From Swiss-Prot:
It comes from Leishmania major. One of its GO terms (molecular function) is ribonucleoprotein complex binding. It is found in: Nucleus, Nucleolus; Nucleus, Nucleoplasm. One of its GO terms (cellular component) is nucleolus. This is Pescadillo homolog. GO terms for biological process: maturation of 5.8S rRNA from tricistronic rRNA transcript (SSU-rRNA, 5.8S rRNA, LSU-rRNA); maturation of LSU-rRNA from tricistronic rRNA transcript (SSU-rRNA, 5.8S rRNA, LSU-rRNA). CDD domains: BRCT_pescadillo_like (cd17709). Residues 634-651 have a biased composition (Basic and acidic residues).
Length: 671
């Protein structure tokens, strides 16, 4: 038996847990909104479920999502939650006006002045108290915005307070506008440092306010979005990121305009041309230390200064890379991406093919397009040349990049230090810390580029054998140095140990689809799970072979079947699915009909019982068993009244009968 102190301690812990955490259902009931609206509100406010340890989860359920109670209570009086409730009330008014045919009221309700809208300005200020915090979230924001700027909208709507399951025209236009403004800023400020073309799209990296921002732009191609996909979670993130980037871009553009104005003023006054350097001022990194500052603070400032100097050196190499070069981009090349790289590196993009004003022509064809004549003074290169020059921070020789030539390997600058410079090495080391699984192999093309940059460079491992061995024998766990074993350390195994070592499990080929603890299951459950192939337990070898043979026979029959047999099999599967759907629909209809019949019969029976009760009361009044009260609003039982009077005469009190529960006899659908 549990001691009373232990029971009390359990109760106190449970109550404390309930006060500190709320489940998703409790949170939605507290906020009086649906789960879809609650999820959207949490995304906008930056509130996420909490991962609890097992002891806490056992108190209220292992499969539930838990939120901090104080965070949910903050949402009760939040402006966005209030606007959501106002929108629900507005929807009811619109439906009422449509049902009653009030066209004038409907026009007034649908105007932008009456329709509720929410603002994310206060939310962004809450989530990002400092500007550098917003810069650190730009990578995810721009990747998502570029994705939805490429997709075509499916719903025409300018507002976002409604919960749309597909991309709206308003969000699509705003996403395209933000992408254009971001590309314009990166090109004007010349902060682009790396680029890479992959099968997913174009990867870019820029240094903005001392932070490395990486984003992905998808390849632009004709697409058709699959129907029936719910996108409201992604659209909620998109809405927030668009509003955040509006603030970020305004700040960046205003700072850039101020820096350009200061530079021009300084050039006019002093005649000194200064580089258009990015402002890396960031809090304590540039603060002047007091005399009595501690060593930890001095070390942090020193690291920030070294990081800042490396980034400045990296930007200085890229900004004047294509200075004096003019590129003409052919029509088959995506001009948006290559114009961004060229402009960010100090080059110019020509709109017309005028050989006297052009130095390079970017063509993605095996030969020149019709109508374009080849000139000897021009260099005709493939698109990879632009990105390789950016990553090498050097105008590479065009050998191997000309039209019709086989291109060299396109190396990712995010996992390998292409230039072997201090700033690149520091960036790659940081990436490997964040992503330990990145392979440290250096391709031969990287050694060639390093040799071009620094003629005195000599590769330590040009063929990559050492790196290959390190990747092959490296493990996630740290290796422990084990001394070599001598003959004295050798111990012979016994017969049982040898037999155990040679024994192979009989269920080696069996697929494990679910992990189940066997001691907790009954024999019947074990048998059922073996039949359904859902248990992590030894299966009979004969059964396993039979299943494997059956699977192989099915695969063989599907490989050898004709198109007519395949069509017939597909048609039979479709018929089975349709039959199952019809059966399910029929079951649902039967349940609805039974529920409706139960409701109607309950109403009819209740009416009949009420009529019978009234008739019985009228009969008792006629027989004299009941009489009316003095005010005429109630009835009194004469026999019960006489008994009460006799008890009062004897000085006793008649025991009162408890009033019945009025909801006890009602049907369940009423309760």
């Amino acid at each position: 038996m549990v001691h009373k102190k232990q029971a009390w301690a359990k109760r106190v812990k449970k109550e404390r847990f309930k006060k500190k955490f709320l489940t998703r259902m409790q949170a939605t009931r507290l906020l009086q909104m649906e789960s879809v609206q609650f999820r959207r509100l949490c995304i906008l406010k930056g509130i996420y479920p909490r991962a609890l340890n097992r002891s806490k989860q056992k108190q209220s359920g292992n499969e539930k999502q838990y939120y901090l109670a104080r965070e949910i209570k903050w949402l009760v009086r939040d402006q966005i939650a209030e606007k959501m409730m106002a929108y629900r009330a507005w929807e009811k008014k619109v439906k009422r006006a449509e049902a009653m045919g009030r066209s004038e009221d409907l026009k007034v309700l649908q105007t932008s002045r009456v329709k509720p809208r929410h603002s994310l300005v206060a939310t962004i200020k809450e989530r990002y108290p400092y500007f550098i915090d917003a810069i650190r979230d730009v990578d995810d924001a721009m990747s998502m915005i570029h994705l939805y700027a490429f997709l075509s909208p499916e719903i025409k709507s300018d507002t976002t307070i409604e919960i749309h399951h597909s991309l709206t025209s308003g969000l699509s236009e705003r996403a395209k506008e933000v992408c254009e403004r971001w590309d314009r800023y990166v090109a004007r400020a010349r902060v682009l440092t790396k680029g890479f073309i992959s099968i997913k799209g174009y990867y870019y990296e820029a240094i903005v306010k001392g932070e490395r921002v990486r984003w992905l732009c998808p390849h632009e191609y004709a697409h058709r979005f699959p129907p029936g996909i719910q996108q409201y979670v992604m659209l909620s993130f998109l809405e927030f990121y668009l509003e955040m980037m509006k603030f970020v871009l305004f700040k960046l553009e205003s700072d850039l305009a101020r820096d350009e104005a200061d530079r021009l003023a300084a050039e006019d006054e002093e005649g000194v041309t200064r580089a258009n350097a990015e402002d890396f001022a960031n809090g304590a990194a540039l603060a002047v230390l007091d005399v009595g500052a501690n060593q930890a603070q001095a070390k942090a400032v020193k690291e920030a200064e070294s990081k800042r100097s490396l980034m400045e050196e990296e930007l200085h190499k890229v900004r004047e890379l294509f200075r004096g070069l003019t590129f003409f981009i052919s029509r088959e090349v995506p001009a948006k991406h290559f114009a961004l790289v060229i402009n960010a590196c100090g080059g110019r993009v020509a709109t017309d093919y005028v050989p006297s004003n052009i130095t390079h022509v970017v063509v993605d064809r095996p030969a020149l397009p019709p109508g374009m004549k080849k000139h000897d003074q021009l260099e005709y290169v493939q698109p990879q040349y632009i990105f390789d020059c950016l990553n090498a921070r050097l105008v590479l020789p065009v050998t191997g990049y000309r039209i019709g030539e086989e291109l060299p390997p396109h190396v990712s600058p995010f996992s390998v230090s292409i230039t072997n410079s201090a700033e690149d090495n520091a960036a790659v080391v940081q990436v490997k810390k964040d992503h330990p699984r990145i392979v440290g192999y250096v391709p031969a093309r990287v050694h060639e580029i390093r040799k071009l940059i620094n003629p005195s460079y000599s590769a330590v491992d040009p063929e990559g054998k050492v790196a290959h061995l390190e990747d092959e024998y490296s493990d996630e766990e740290s290796h422990v140095a084990v001394p070599e074993m001598d003959m004295e350390d050798d111990v012979s195994l016994s017969g049982d140990e040898l037999a155990e070592a040679r024994r192979k499990p009989a269920w080696q080929e069996e697929e494990v689809t679910e992990e189940v603890q066997r001691p907790k299951l009954s024999a019947f459950k074990v048998k059922k799970q073996r039949e359904m192939n859902l248990m992590n337990a030894p299966t009979n070898e004969v059964v396993a072979r039979r299943r494997q043979a059956l699977r192989k026979a099915q695969e063989k029959s599907r490989q050898t079947e004709t198109s007519e047999a395949r069509l017939q099999r597909k048609m039979s599967e479709v018929k089975r699915q349709e039959a199952a759907t019809r059966k399910m629909q029929l079951q649902v209809a039967r349940k609805k009909a039974a529920r409706f019949y139960k409701m109607v019969s309950g109403v009819v029976q209740g009416t009949a019982k009420k009529v019978a009760t009234l008739e019985a009361k009228a009969k008792h009044i006629a027989e004299g068993k009941l009489r009316k009260t003095e005010d005429g609003k109630g009835l009194v039982n004469k026999r019960l009244e006489a008994r009460r009077q006799r008890a009062e005469a004897k000085g006793k009190k008649l025991k009162e009968r408890k009033a019945g529960n009025p909801y006890k006899k009602l049907p369940k659908w009423v309760q």
